[in-house]
Amino acid sequence: MEGKRNGQTRLAYVLGVPLADNCVRQWPQMQELVQGRELIGSVEGNFEAVTLEVGRRLRLGDVVVVEWSINYGDDRIYRNVTIGELEHGEAVRVTDYWGEPVNTPEWRVEMTARLEMPPDGVWPSKDRLKHY
């Protein structure tokens, strides 16, 4: 396994802090809730081909906000935002939001500018993602 791990889960690496035993992970897109560090690790274990990398991590008191990229092994790069709520330095509640990049709708092309996404920026490119 390449890359450095910070704890027993990929989520702990993404957040940069350990998970509390009773950590709750929320996925609003699917109306799902994963309860407990051990179960979070078990769910992650079903995605062996995953590579990921953090682009930016902001700590605001007892809140961590992380922008990161993930490839589930099918070369579709999802861009994510994860919000972790901390108690005593451990994540107790985490909410993940993600989306697969899509093309700009034709009607909007003339109204917007292209967002520059350098490979080593906030949204790491596919070649910078690692197994954790």
Regions found by a protein language model. Give the residues of each.
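C-terminal and inter-domain tail/linker signature
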Residues: 1-132
